[in-house]
Amino acid sequence: MADSIRLQTFPSKPRVFVLTDISNEPDDAESLVRYLLYSNQFQTEGLVAVSSTWMKNKVCPQDIHKILDAYAGAVDNLNKHTHPDYPYPSANRLRTLVKSGPPMYGFAGVGTDKPLTDGAQLLLERIKAPIEDPLWVLVWGGTNVLAQVLLSIRDQCSAEEATKLRAKLRVYTISDQDDTSAWIRTQFPDVFYISSIHGWNQYGLAAWTGISGDKYYGFDQGGPDFSKVSKQWIKENIQIGPLGSAYPDYLFIPEGDTPTFLYLIQNGLGDREHPEYGSWGGRYALTDASDAGQQGKHYSDMSDSVIGIDGKTYRSNQATIWRWRNTFQNDFAARIQWSLNPSLASTNHHPIVIVNGSRSQKPLQFEAEAGSTIELDASQTYDPDGDDLTFTWWQYREPSATQWLVQFEVSELGIEKLDTQGKRIKVMVPEPEKSCMDLISRTPLAKGQLLHLILEVTDSGTPTLTSYRRVLIQSTNKDLRGGKPLKEGEELNAIGDAMKNYTD
């Protein structure tokens, strides 16, 4: 039987402020149900009902309250399954955070002549709070509440203060759902802003649809396991108990908004300040990575290559999310069991990953000379329920790449097991010719590629649960070894020069 003191801890909770067009269709309610199951990992600071292009003339805070009423019937059970220092928030506390944005579409609710709504006022207060930690604004609908606040900050604060306040913002939106989103990115390019960009309402082109949209939008057919988001699976595993019963049947795709907070889940996989690293919430890169011009902070979709359930390889932006579907759906189902069952003995809990003595969920970082080896030891890892554990180490190559052709640019780590279970491994850093070369000129670099190694630890409970640890290996080449010898008169000044002899 698990001892609650041995369960996961969350010493650094991200501050979260949700803007939701709940009731335009069922998926916002679905996402809110799941969000509440993770709410002990977050410092929730606002739950604001907003409009969108799909619900232009009203907002529905009452429907947030309905979900919180269901949560009230589950929170005592949930608190039996968390470390005593990191309890779930009470329903009453969350109820005080429910506010409204303007019951009108986009810019119709924004302007210097329009008073701030109570939702915008709360957001402004939380941005101005004397707290250094960033505020994550998760946008499931339109962004006019955020636009109201940014306009107010610009008009009422000095330029220096306004810049400091915007620097505290971290925004993740589910595409653009009103006419203020593009304006925000244009007027305030310094705001950290994750959003898929595509033609208006062409959601099948967006990364976030990888959560569940493969059949509806027709992408990557045969890759993702659709059974884990089917209506039958949801009925059997999610729509049960006091909270799960508030999860409505889906209409288009389930939980389109969920990637915004899957990105923040503290499971050892992601780094919320680095969207390019990848996590359950997808993988995103700066749309302008230059150090000139606007120097904007808009992040948009990247792609991953993933082997699907049919054994074929799929590469897409949606794959950056659906590649994790089995694990995040199992995680969801396990938490639903917590919500209806107070017994630790009859439910499953996450493995606690410890690598080289560290149980932090932040990436473990090394500098290693090209051609050298490092040893990693996860033998102290344990399962609080006493389940058997499976250790899987693999290189996540895509985050190391600077362009599309990953296999051309990113060298492979050597991974050697030092015991039968793979708790301990030796990692061989590639030689400088592979890990510390300029992409185009092929001249040696003192500081080469940042290589990503992922440890997945999966238990034998029901459903199986997975925890992670990311290891970052910064390759170095202090003596500037290697480099491509050039023939007399030969120059490598363009990518075509570097790749002319490359074969995949």
Give the predicted meaning of each segment:
Residues 492-504:
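Ser/Thr/Pro-rich, acidic low-complexity intrinsically disordered regulatory segments
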Residues 388, 464-468:
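A structural signal for beta-strand boundary/capping segments at domain termini and interdomain linkers
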Residues 477-494:
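Low-complexity, Pro/Ser/Thr- and charge-rich linker/hinge segments at domain boundaries
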Residues 1-421, 431-434, 443-445, 483:
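N-terminal acidic, glycine/proline-rich low-complexity segments
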Residues 450, 470-475:
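Long, low-complexity intrinsically disordered regions enriched in Ser/Thr/Pro/Gly
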Residues 423-427:
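Short strand-edge motifs at loop-to-beta-strand transitions and within beta-strands
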Residues 447-453:
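Exposed beta-strand face motif in extracellular beta-rich ectodomains
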Residues 457-464:
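Short, solvent-exposed loop/turn segments at the edges of extracellular beta-sandwich modules
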